[in-house]
């Protein structure tokens, strides 16, 4: 009976494992797995379809092909379970053992495993200290390797050709041993003594950098072998395991052909060659034949393991490369990504979606037929429970016949059972939401209009998938966490996601506009009901201005009850009627204005913060209903007459054409270069297009009407097109400009701008040429979109992979580190206020009042909307907040450092997978980012033309710390710093605006003066960059030779001549000298820089126009030379997605700038051929020098004092330099600002903390600078958390700890270098990751989400984190219990046998224990 029960006991996998280890298998291990040796290459008998004995599908080895039946049919049925048939040798058992029983092949000659040979760096090469080329020559029988030199002069490990070998053999006879093939390699590997090698390498860590690097690499591999207990000779195999046959099936097709897995072909080839080799060895065949066969065997084994890794790939009959074992697991269609990370799911369906305007937010319409299929098991169980069907079979029949009772049961089953809807591509967590199904007729799923924004769905044929959560736990999670009405905020930025759009916005906007002199204007009503009556009877129009008495409910501070308060309000009919839908506690002022899309969003946000989730969802639903109704009633439509072409358009275009003609004239007479002409023309047309757009909008947006008193007044226009754009329902000013203004400039496919614009608009119609020019851009747009989607998806994948294991694991790590946040100000505009930046963060230290120094906000408090009101009132301009970057939690993050969970509005919960959320928030808008990189012109050139800054507000002038200026001969202040900024602060000392001022600008203000708004603070020439002297003196030219280093240019029109510095590449002679100017004082001595003995030397860069004469007297601030900006290389501004990817991959930019390595004084040493030697001397006299190419623009001059990390050579910054010189905080600031710049340009809002989370993951590894007493190796990169753990251990033992330097890894690198080999292997470079892991005998602790998904456990995030914690706690308790029981037993044993213990102590013969 017990056997029978065991039989029905379900096959349960081993639940309890905490880690997975990977290693190399020894030959004994492989044999122990095996159920028999595969000796023949035959597969199955094509007539009987039975497997051949000893072949690749042998039933004796792998198990029976029919359940509980042996091959010859002697034993059938369950009663013979476990019997081995004496006739055919097959065990009688289930056929599914053919999925896990392995076989083996005994190789007649050893074969090297190709992964350890060819996967770079070659592990075999590292262990043997031989080059890959040499090992290959030995393995493939082209050369001998010396295994035992004996008493000869030969060296072990040395390589010899066949001729050498013959010569040496004749000379020395059998004194030495040299071998070919894998045997030789295996022998060498077996003779390596790991301990001795490790000692030797550890002692040999000095000398050249290359040697240290090589030794540390070898040491790492040796230590790995030693630690994991793996013997190096196992990298060469004597036994080959054979995959279970059901994993490489052979399926008979009709017509006598077979479909087979490629592995069978590869195995057959190995077996054939192996058998042939064995026979040749038996026959003692000539060496050369045997050798060839061994080589072929090695090649066959190579292709089986990884086809195409070395040499040509083996091909099948149809010339396509065979799919080897390695190909099975790697790539998108490999085991990891196809089957383990992305599975097909049962209980799911998909259909087209249609709009369901009558649904509530938490509902979706589910077609009846689909529901019937999806909920089948629930219906069956219900039918059985009600006694309508006795068996499942009967229930099935009942359902198929479709009796009315089935539909009733379906209604019952579906009640309160949420289903999940998903729309591909699922770019963020709102791409899957749960809804309560409502049964509908038809075959399309109905979707609530408000969730379309989150799904990015529209109803032009989109499809969605439905999934049914089965277990009670799954239903509960779907209900509490995923229900659409619980997800009303975007996790990326905390804005509401259920904002109405399009028709709804238009309806609400129209109804809340006011029209002058509408019917019923000036009436006063007693309540809203009366207004509704008047509207219904046609006595008032919906846009009429009226007064009405409204009741507002305000919350009482003490009791928390709502108290009514009624007052007379000036409003319009539409707004008064809308007031009905406001929840209690939301003031009428929120809708007493024209509701545009932004306003509606703000309304929903305010409602969420003030009235809570439930009220907000109800409000959103009501807004939706009203909006649709009002839009229908408004009857807004557009006609061609709504597109008003501005009257001034003709004049503006004529003026522009005149300007362009002038420039053409200048170009012909040689005043401007071709490039300047193009830029200016493009600029003129760009400006004209904007102006036409401006006058058009001005004309569209206003209309003249008579008011009640018969006067003509302006009012905002009721033009349909204008209303659509103004409300945010559809279209934008730019699009209206194309309809009624002018289309403007078009781009060529390569992104450069065509200088002849399209002056027509769509209202007037385009001519053939204009239409043709338009097609360029339109087609490129479509092609770009396709590329963009793929690139964006790949970026998201990399981001998710690098952050997937970051989960909130504790409440507070107790640090007070953080970053100081202030408002983001650029060019005098506040781009992002302090409030927006710190909302939802936790304060790191107390926030003090700037004047009274009292505590405004204590440390460790989350800044919500109310707290921020207090902060703003106190005029605080800098707050230090906690950040994921400085969180001290080892594995994971703490809630305080993360702050508010943006998708829910409260402090983040433990178990929230913040890493994945960050990755999704950054990746999701990726498709909106432009791929097109702006070339200078059009968009970018207009920014460059700024030539002055003016104050935007009244205030007090201050300069930043790096601002430096001199007074020139005319008494003007000239800026000589590169990063100077003017700061304007208000009377509280709060910074209001900040303006960057370029080198060479003239200041019109002094420090500490008061200015009025509109004052011009500074101006400069935007088209040239000056070079200015700080000191007075007489100019003395050096190396300025006409025709050699400079050329004289004479202007044909004006006749003036200027000197231009020639590019050294074009010079005939004097290629290495640099034209420069020194200054002499009155006595004729060189002027020195104060405080140094360096003379003032100012170089003229390439292409600069020299503005002074030799011997001229100069005052400080005088311009020595100008560099035309157009002459500078116009660097492409990498924009959009590629820029984001570049930042997260931490790539060093090309033409990168140089930062000062230390604080000190600049000097120039001896120059080399094309480079300048730039030196920095610190106060202690230490010198750092760097060679800078001459064509680079050096931003410093001799004798200037620079600070560590300051820019000294022009160019984009390298993130690695920023980290090294300025630290983590500066690096984070740089990456966050740069990424935000790209997204801001597209109008995408992302919270800073998401980017910080990614930066934390990029910094998660450190490089060991000094290993101390730890087991680390110098220069090794290790996980930060594990290093800190090791150091804690060392401290506890009183040993020396390891010191480290921070390392910044790009996201791809960081994903591949995680401690989890399962996660890394499923990401990219599977072979390399697994090879490395196998040699190191790595354990995967299954910490991240991905590894757990792959091994099929609950993920350690969300509810899964609690489950894992509970499981661990229970295991620990069980362990403790087991130990205590064992102790108890031991004590009892001891009490039973007192004599034995005592005697044993004395040391006599112990007495035999008493008989029990």
Curated annotation (Swiss-Prot):
Its cofactor is Mg(2+); Zn(2+). Binds 1 Mg(2+) ion per subunit. Zn(2+) 1 binds at residues 70, 72, 85, 88. Residues 1388-1412 are annotated as: Disordered. One of its GO terms (biological process) is DNA-templated transcription. GO terms for molecular function: DNA binding; DNA-directed RNA polymerase activity; magnesium ion binding; zinc ion binding. It holds the Pfam family RNA_pol_Rpb1_4. One of its GO terms (cellular component) is DNA-directed RNA polymerase complex. Keywords: DNA-directed RNA polymerase, Magnesium, Metal-binding, Nucleotidyltransferase, Transcription, Transferase, Zinc. Residues 1393-1405 have a biased composition (Low complexity). It catalyses: RNA(n) + a ribonucleoside 5'-triphosphate = RNA(n+1) + diphosphate. SUPFAM superfamilies: beta and beta-prime subunits of DNA dependent RNA-polymerase (SSF64484). Mg(2+) binds at residues 458, 460, 462. The RNAP catalytic core consists of 2 alpha, 1 beta, 1 beta' and 1 omega subunit. When a sigma factor is associated with the core the holoenzyme is formed, which can initiate transcription. Belongs to the RNA polymerase beta' chain family. DNA-dependent RNA polymerase catalyzes the transcription of DNA into RNA using the four ribonucleoside triphosphates as substrates. PANTHER family: DNA-DIRECTED RNA POLYMERASE, DNA-DIRECTED RNA POLYMERASE SUBUNIT BETA. This is DNA-directed RNA polymerase subunit beta'. It comes from Methylibium petroleiphilum (strain ATCC BAA-1232 / LMG 22953 / PM1). The gene is rpoC.
């Amino acid at each position: 009976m017990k056997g029978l029960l065991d039989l029905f006991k379900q096959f349960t996998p081993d639940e309890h494992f905490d880690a997975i280890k990977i290693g190399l298998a020894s030959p004994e291990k492989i044999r122990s797995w095996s159920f028999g040796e595969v000796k023949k290459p035959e597969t199955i008998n094509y007539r009987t379809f039975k497997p051949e004995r000893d072949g690749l599908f042998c039933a004796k080895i792998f198990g029976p092909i029919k359940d509980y039946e042996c091959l010859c049919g002697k034993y059938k049925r369950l009663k013979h379970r476990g019997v081995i048939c004496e006739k055919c040798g097959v065990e009688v058992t289930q056929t599914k053992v053919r999925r896990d029983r392995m076989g083996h092949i005994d190789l007649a000659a050893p074969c090297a495993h190709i992964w350890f040979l060819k996967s770079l760096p070659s592990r075999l090469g590292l262990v043997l200290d031989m080059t890959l080329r040499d090992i290959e020559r030995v393995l493939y029988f082209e050369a001998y390797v010396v295994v035992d030199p004996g008493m000869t002069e030969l060296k072990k490990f040395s390589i010899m050709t066949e001729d050498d070998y013959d010569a040496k053999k004749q000379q020395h006879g059998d004194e030495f041993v040299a071998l070919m093939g894998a045997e030789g390699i295996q022998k060498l590997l077996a003779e390596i003594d790991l301990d001795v090698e490790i000692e030797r390498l550890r002692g040999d860590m000095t000398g050249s950098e290359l040697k240290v690097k090589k030794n540390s690499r070898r040491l790492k591999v040796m230590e790995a072998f030693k630690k994991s207990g793996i013997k190096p000779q196992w990298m060469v195999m004597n036994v080959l395991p054979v995959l279970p046959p059901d994993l490489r099936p052979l399926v008979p097709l009709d017509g006598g052909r077979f479909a087979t897995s490629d592995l069978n072909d590869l195995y057959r080839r190995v077996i054939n060659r192996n058998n042939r080799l064995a026979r040749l060895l038996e026959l003692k065949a000539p060496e050369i034949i045997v050798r060839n066969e061994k080589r072929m065997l090695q090649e066959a084994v190579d292709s089986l393991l990884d086809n195409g890794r070395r040499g040509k790939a083996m091909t099948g009959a149809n010339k396509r490369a065979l799919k080897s074992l390695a190909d099975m697991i790697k790539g998108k269609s490999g085991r990891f990504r196809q089957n383990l990370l992305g599975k097909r799911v049962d209980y799911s369906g998909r259909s087209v979606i249609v709009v369901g305007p009558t649904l509530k937010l938490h509902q979706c319409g589910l077609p009846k037929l689909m529901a019937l299929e999806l909920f089948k098991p629930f219906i069956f169980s219900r039918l059985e429970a009600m006694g309508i069907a006795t068996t499942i079979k009967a229930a099935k029949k009942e359902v198929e016949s479709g009796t009315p009772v089935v539909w009733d049961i379906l209604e019952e089953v579906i009640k309160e059972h949420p289903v999940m809807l998903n729309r591909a591509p699922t770019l963020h967590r709102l791409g899957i939401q749960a809804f309560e199904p409502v049964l509908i007729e038809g075959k399309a799923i109905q979707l609530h209009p408000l969730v379309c924004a989150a799904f990015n769905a529209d109803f032009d044929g989109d499809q969605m998938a439905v999934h049914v959560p089965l277990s009670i736990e799954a239903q509960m999670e779907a209900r509490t966490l995923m229900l659409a009405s619980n997800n009303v905020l975007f996790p990326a930025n905390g804005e509401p996601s259920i904002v109405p759009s399009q028709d709804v916005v238009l309806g609400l906007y129209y109804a809340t506009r006011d029209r002058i002199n509408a019917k019923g204007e000036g009436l006063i009503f007693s309540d809203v009901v009366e207004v509704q009556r008047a509207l219904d009877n046609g006595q008032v129009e919906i846009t009429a201005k009226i007064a009405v008495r409204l009741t507002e409910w305000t919350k009482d501070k003490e009791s928390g009850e709502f108290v009514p308060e009624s007052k007379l309000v000036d409003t319009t009919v539409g707004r008064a009627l809308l007031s009905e839908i406001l929840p209690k506690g939301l003031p009428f002022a929120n809708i007493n204005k024209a509701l545009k899309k932004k306003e509606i969003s703000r309304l929903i946000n305010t409602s969420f913060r003030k009235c809570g989730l439930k009220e907000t969802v109800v409000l959103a639903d009501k807004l939706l209903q009203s909006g649709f109704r009002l839009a229908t009633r408004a009857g807004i439509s557009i006609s061609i007459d709504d597109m008003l072409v501005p009257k001034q358009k003709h004049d503006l275009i004529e003026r522009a054409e005149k300007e362009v003609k002038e420039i053409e004239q200048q170009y012909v007479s040689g005043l401007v270069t071709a490039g300047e002409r193009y830029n200016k023309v493009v600029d003129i047309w760009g400006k004209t297009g904007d102006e036409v757009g401006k006058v058009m909008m001005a004309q569209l947006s206003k209309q003249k009407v008579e008011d009640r008193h018969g006067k003509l007044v302006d009012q905002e226009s009721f033009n349909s097109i204008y209303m659509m754009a103004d409300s945010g329902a559809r279209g934008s000013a730019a699009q209206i400009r194309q309809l009624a203004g002018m289309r403007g400039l078009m781009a060529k496919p390569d992104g450069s701008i065509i200088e002849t614009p399209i002056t027509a608009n769509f209202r007037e119609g385009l001519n053939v040429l204009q239409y043709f020019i338009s097609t360029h851009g339109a087609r490129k747009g479509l092609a770009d979109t396709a590329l963009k989607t793929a690139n964006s998806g790949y970026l998201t994948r990399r981001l998710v992979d690098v952050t997937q294991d970051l989960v909130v694991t504790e409440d507070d790590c107790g640090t007070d580190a953080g970053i100081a946040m202030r408002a983001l100000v650029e060019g005098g505009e506040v781009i992002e206020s302090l409030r927006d930046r710190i909302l939802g963060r936790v304060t790191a230290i107390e926030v003090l009042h700037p004047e009274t120094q009292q505590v405004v906000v204590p440390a460790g408090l989350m800044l919500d909307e109310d707290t921020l009101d207090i902060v703003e009132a106190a005029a605080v301009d800098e707050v230090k907040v906690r950040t994921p970057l400085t969180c001290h939690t080892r594995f994971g993050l703490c809630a305080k450092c993360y702050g508010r969970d943006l998708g829910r509005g409260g402090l983040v919960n433990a178990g929230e997978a913040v890493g994945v959320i960050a990755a999704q928030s950054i990746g999701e808008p990726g498709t909106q980012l432009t791929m097109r990189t702006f070339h200078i012109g059009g968009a970018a050139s207009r920014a460059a033309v700024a030539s002055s800054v003016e104050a935007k507000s009244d205030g007090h002038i201050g300069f930043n710390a790096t601002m430096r200026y001199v007074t020139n001969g005319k008494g003007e202040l000239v800026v000589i710093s590169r990063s100077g900024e003017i700061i304007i602060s208000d009377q509280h000392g709060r910074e209001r605006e900040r303006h960057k001022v370029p080198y060479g600008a003239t200041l019109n203000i002094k420090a500490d003066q008061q200015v009025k708004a509109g004052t011009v603070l500074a101006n400069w020439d935007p088209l040239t960059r000056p070079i200015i002297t700080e000191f007075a003196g007489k100019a003395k030219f050096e190396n300025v030779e006409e025709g050699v280093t400079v050329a004289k240019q004479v202007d044909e029109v004006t006749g003036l001549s200027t000197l231009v510095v020639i590019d050294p590449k074009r010079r005939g002679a004097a290629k290495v000298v640099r034209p420069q100017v020194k200054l002499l004082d009155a006595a004729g001595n060189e002027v020195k820089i104060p405080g140094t003995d360096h003379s003032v030397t100012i170089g003229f860069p390439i292409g600069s126009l020299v503005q002074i004469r030799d011997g001229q007297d100069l005052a400080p601030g005088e311009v020595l030379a100008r560099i035309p900006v157009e002459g500078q290389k116009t660097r492409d501004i990498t924009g959009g997605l590629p820029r984001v990817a570049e930042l997260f991959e931490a790539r060093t930019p090309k033409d990168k700038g140089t930062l000062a390595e230390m604080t000190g004084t600049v000097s120039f040493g001896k120059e080399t051929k094309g480079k300048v030697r730039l030196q920095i001397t610190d106060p202690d006299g230490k010198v750092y020098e760097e060679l800078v190419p001459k064509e680079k623009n050096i931003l410093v001059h001799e004798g200037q004092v620079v600070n560590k990390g300051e820019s000294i050579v022009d160019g984009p910054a390298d993130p690695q330099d920023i980290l090294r010189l300025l630290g983590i905080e500066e690096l984070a600031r740089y990456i966050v600002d740069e990424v935000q710049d790209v997204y801001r340009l597209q109008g995408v809002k992302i919270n800073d903390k998401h980017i910080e989370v990614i930066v934390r993951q990029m910094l998660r590894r450190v490089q060991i600078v000094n290993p101390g007493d730890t087991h680390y190796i110098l220069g090794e990169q290790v996980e930060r958390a594990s290093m800190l753990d090791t150091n804690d251990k060392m401290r506890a033992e009183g040993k020396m700890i390891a010191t480290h330097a921070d390392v910044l890894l790009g996201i791809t690198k960081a994903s591949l270098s995680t401690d989890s080999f399962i996660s890394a292997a499923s990401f990219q470079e599977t072979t390399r990751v697994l090879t490395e892991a196998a040699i190191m005998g790595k354990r995967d602790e299954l910490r991240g989400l991905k590894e757990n998904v792959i091994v099929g456990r609950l993920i350690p995030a969300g509810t899964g984190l609690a489950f894992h914690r509970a499981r661990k706690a229970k295991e620990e308790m069980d362990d403790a219990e087991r130990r205590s029981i064992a102790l108890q037993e031991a004590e009892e044993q001891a009490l039973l046998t007192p004599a034995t213990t005592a005697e044993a102590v004395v040391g006599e013969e112990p007495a035999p224990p008493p008989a029990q």
